[in-house]
A protein has these predicted regions:
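Non-catalytic cap/lid and distal C-terminal segments of serine-dependent acyl enzymes
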Residues: 1-237
Length: 237
């Protein structure tokens, strides 16, 4: 086949808020430490491992790229449409999110509504996504006041976790695959284009592809990245 034998591990990393960005968070949990240490240790105890790679899409793609930046234990990573460019991804969602949560009286009241509801509306999912980010990057509340004016300090906490910010500090990445759809409905193509350009300026080698598509229905991209990851793990071992 196109791909050499490999062990594929697909852990359930959903949280009570749904999303997971794979960083250490006081509210959501120490998911970065879990990936770097706990999961790798468990796998090494069970199997004969020659190396480790990370691949993910959307939040998982974000996790792959930042863990590749911050950890030194991954032999290859692949980021499919991973969160990047927080201004255009999350910042422009604050007004809509604020409107939704204030229907219920605030963030905590909205979360109570979601947990007790028999079903969720489409707008509930997007609101919950932003609140999951707030719990990951800050104190669980939105980085805006009741008039949707940004709290600069709180928003800076979010931006400190944007790959566009992190790449200025963490530049020793393993072999890295990045791709994104040119019609991504969350504007991620703009952030990842900026990251791609900055990595080129910094001389950081990476595989880059922008494909025809959106943020949805992109599982087929794994047909390209998984064989690439396995090949790079073999080269490193």
């Amino acid at each position: 086949g196109k791909m050499d034998p490999a062990i594929l591990v697909m852990p359930d990393t959903f949280t009570s808020l749904g999303g997971n960005q794979f960083i250490d968070s006081e509210i959501v949990g120490k998911w970065g430490t879990w990936l770097e240490n706990d999961l790798r240790e468990q796998l090494s105890n069970r199997y004969e491992i020659s190396g480790f790679g990370l691949v993910g899409k959307s939040s998982g793609g974000y996790g792959a790229i930042i863990r590749g930046m911050m950890d030194d234990c991954w032999d290859a990573i692949a980021c499919h449409s991973g969160d990047c460019g927080f201004e255009l991804l999350f910042g422009i969602e604050m007004a809509t999110t604020l409107t939704e949560v204030m229907v219920y009286g605030g963030e905590s009241e909205f979360l109570k509504h979601v947990k007790s509801a028999q079903s969720m509306k489409p707008e509930d999912f997007h609101t919950l996504m932003i609140l999951a980010m707030a719990a990951t990057y800050s104190d669980g509340t939105l980085p805006v006041n009741s008039n949707c004016i940004f709290d600069d300090d709180k928003w800076a906490q979010w931006l400190s976790w944007d790959p566009l910010t992190l790449i200025e500090k963490y530049q020793n990445l393993p072999p890295c695959w990045i791709d994104v759809g040119n019609k991504d409905q969350y504007n991620i193509q703009y952030g990842l284009r900026q990251l791609h350009n900055r990595m080129n300026e910094l001389g950081i080698e990476h595989q880059w592809e922008e494909f025809q598509g959106t943020h949805s229905g992109i599982d087929h991209r794994l047909d390209l990245s998984l064989p690439w990851i396995v090949k790079n793990i073999q080269s490193a071992s």
